[in-house]
Each structure stands twice: as C-alpha cells, then as structure tokens.
Amino acid sequence: MLIKQFSRRPKNMKVQILLAFAALFVLAVGSYASESKKLDLRDASFSAMFSADYQLNPQERGCRYFLGECKKTSECCEHLACHDKHKWCAWDWTIGK
C-alpha cells in the first residue's frame, strides 16, 4: 500500500508541473500579444499624426507647415527646413520676418 502511494505521487506531481508550465506559457503568449497590439496602435497613431497633411494640397497653401511632409527645403514655409532623416518640415532655428 505504501509503495502504491509513492508510485502515484510522481505521476500526479508531473501532471501538476506540466499544468503549471502550460499556464505560464499561456500567460506569456497572452502578455506578448497584448503588448504587440499596444505597440501597433501607438505606431499607427504616430504615423497618422504626421501624415495628416496629405489632405491639404500644397499648391493651395503655397508651402508646407511645421511637421508637414517634404522632399526639399524649398517646399517648407519660412523659417522651416526639410529634415534629412524624417522628411518633414522642422524649425531651422531662425527668427524674424
């Protein structure tokens, strides 16, 4: 009788350990998926914020305003320059009329 109890325990313990690892795996996958959705939403809102100037025609307004998309500095308004890396109009550190 004592031998039967010890022979059952390791099987039961193996099942418990397996269930614990399975639960940790499910939690890890769920956490990763949740974080991935947050990052995707953040990236989408960030890119939408800076690409919103496509709705305005540059010929109608004459120049591109602050953080507007550009290819060269001549497209940007006064006191703005086209940023080399990000390709948007940024302040060129000049002041005056």
Curated annotation (Swiss-Prot):
One of its GO terms (cellular component) is extracellular region. PROSITE patterns: HWTX_1. Residues 34-61 form a propeptide. Keywords: Disulfide bond, Ion channel impairing toxin, Knottin, Secreted, Signal, Toxin. GO terms for molecular function: ion channel inhibitor activity; toxin activity. It holds the Pfam family Toxin_12. Residues 1-33 form the signal peptide. It is found in: Secreted. Expressed by the venom gland. Disulfide bonds join C63-C77, C70-C82, C76-C89. Transmembrane segments: none annotated. Belongs to the neurotoxin 10 (Hwtx-1) family. 12 (Hntx-12) subfamily. The presence of a 'disulfide through disulfide knot' structurally defines this protein as a knottin. This is U6-theraphotoxin-Hhn1a 2. It comes from Cyriopagopus hainanus (Chinese bird spider). The lineage of its organism: Eukaryota, Metazoa, Ecdysozoa, Arthropoda, Chelicerata.
